[in-house]
């Protein structure tokens, strides 16, 4: 039995509220159970220096957590004077994931920065950030298309992410913190709307896992991604 009472293949409730910020070119608030992440997209009219005069655009991401997103207060990283290794790893993952869903030549020489701020954390914050970040990106690109700044749509597919793991000996979908903190194996799966793999991160936290178990988790992830893509489409109308 899962702590939440969910079935093994059952996602947490998912909602995505678009256009929650006045100034950002794209924004949304994604809720996956008790994990809530505010995602925004900001368009910059020039690419990073390494892409100057290449005709290619770029999508990058920044990630952070509010001090009381967790059960006890975390010190702000700005106060500490540097980002943690975990933060750097997560924001690189978000950027890689979202870039896999765009045609950078169609985007042109500009950069879109996705900011993901965790308001409340209960497991799966990086997955929620990718899923919500894509919606913010989509909304920002829509503005570029409407203004005629870009001619062809640079977004080639949906991108979403979900966690899966082995909890109490059973493969489960969309781990919350109670499960994630004690899972024998956990993983993050990033897929496109067409169910193509972008990134898989899996690790054995306790015992090793088999190839068959990995396949079971991928099957769960594919079903979860389908639900998340449906939520993205519903948010965009």
UniProtKB/Swiss-Prot annotation:
The main enzyme category here is: transferase
Q: Which GO terms describe its biological process?
A: rRNA catabolic process; rRNA processing; tRNA processing
Q: Which GO terms describe its molecular function?
A: 3'-5'-RNA exonuclease activity; tRNA binding; tRNA nucleotidyltransferase activity
Catalysed reaction(s)? tRNA(n+1) + phosphate = tRNA(n) + a ribonucleoside 5'-diphosphate
Q: What is its EC number?
A: 2.7.7.56
Q: Which Pfam families match?
A: RNase_PH (PF01138), RNase_PH_C (PF03725)
Q: Which residues form a coiled coil?
A: none
SUPFAM superfamilies assigned? Ribonuclease PH domain 2-like (SSF55666), Ribosomal protein S5 domain 2-like (SSF54211)
Q: Which residues hold phosphate?
A: 86, 124-126
Q: Which family does it belong to?
A: Belongs to the RNase PH family.
The record's note on quaternary structure and interaction partners says: Homohexameric ring arranged as a trimer of dimers.
This chain's function reads: Phosphorolytic 3'-5' exoribonuclease that plays an important role in tRNA 3'-end maturation. Removes nucleotide residues following the 3'-CCA terminus of tRNAs; can also add nucleotides to the ends of RNA molecules by using nucleoside diphosphates as substrates, but this may not be physiologically important. Probably plays a role in initiation of 16S rRNA degradation (leading to ribosome degradation) during starvation.
Q: Which protein is depicted? A: Ribonuclease PH
């Amino acid at each position: 039995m899962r702590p939440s009472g969910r079935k093994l293949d059952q996602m947490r409730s998912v909602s995505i509220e678009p256009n929650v910020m006045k100034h950002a070119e794209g924004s949304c608030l994604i809720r996956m159970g008790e994990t809530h992440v505010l995602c925004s997209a900001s368009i910059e009219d020039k690419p990073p220096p390494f892409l100057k005069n290449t005709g290619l655009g770029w999508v990058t991401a920044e990630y952070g957590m509010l001090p009381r997103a967790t059960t006890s207060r975390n010190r702000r990283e700005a106060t500490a004077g540097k980002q943690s290794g975990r933060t750097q790893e997560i924001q690189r993952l978000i950027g890689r994931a979202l870039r896999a869903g765009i045609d950078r030549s169609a985007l042109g020489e500009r950069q879109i920065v996705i900011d993901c701020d965790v308001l409340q954390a209960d497991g799966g914050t990086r997955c929620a950030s990718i899923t919500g970040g894509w919606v913010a990106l989509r909304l920002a690109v829509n503005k570029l298309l409407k203004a005629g700044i870009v001619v062809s749509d640079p977004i080639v597919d949906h991108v979403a992410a979900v966690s899966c793991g082995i909890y109490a000996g059973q493969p489960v979908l969309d781990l919350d913190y109670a499960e994630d903190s004690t899972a024998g194996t956990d993983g993050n799966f990033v897929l496109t709307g067409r169910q193509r793999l972008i990134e898989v991160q899996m690790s054995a936290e306790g015992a090793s896992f088999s190839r068959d178990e990995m396949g079971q988790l991928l099957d769960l992830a594919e079903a979860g991604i389908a639900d998340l893509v449906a939520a993205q489409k519903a948010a965009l109308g």
